[in-house]
Amino acid sequence: MVRATGSVASRARRKRILKQAKGFWGDRKGHFRQSRSSVMRAMAFNYMHRKDRKGDFRSLWISRLNVASRIHGLSYSRLINGLKQAGINLNRKMLSEMAIHDPQGFALVAAQAKLALEASIQG
């Protein structure tokens, strides 16, 4: 009979997978074979959604900016265009935070964008 070796490493590997499967339901929690496939699937979703989160936040900031800019008589796209023409380099996250926490400051920025747009139309 062949001598079994590597029991410490095998146990550690199985233990690591079962630890990651904590909170899963049914056999997926305690049986190694099912836990392994469930953990791999969960990790794949985790990877995907970490990438998706960036776009989700960008969409949120754009939605907030659209609402805030319409209060000042601009659409979102015209606001961004006006900011570029005015040479104001604030990213969407900072503009969104400004619109929420510093409405007066955002009003000044929107006014600058509006002036830059009007100047480009006239000249």
Curated annotation (Swiss-Prot):
GO MF term list: rRNA binding; structural constituent of ribosome
Keyword Ribosomal protein set for record: yes
Single GO cellular component term: ribonucleoprotein complex
InterPro entries: Ribosomal_bL20, RIBOSOMAL_L20_CS, Ribosomal_protein_bL20_C
One BP term from GO: ribosomal large subunit assembly
UniProt keyword list: Ribonucleoprotein, Ribosomal protein, RNA-binding, rRNA-binding
HAMAP family assigned: Ribosomal_bL20
NCBIfam families: rplT_bact (TIGR01032)
Membership in a protein family: Belongs to the bacterial ribosomal protein bL20 family.
Role this protein plays: Binds directly to 23S ribosomal RNA and is necessary for the in vitro assembly process of the 50S ribosomal subunit. It is not involved in the protein synthesizing functions of that subunit.
Protein name per UniProt: Large ribosomal subunit protein bL20
Organism: Chlamydia muridarum (strain MoPn / Nigg)
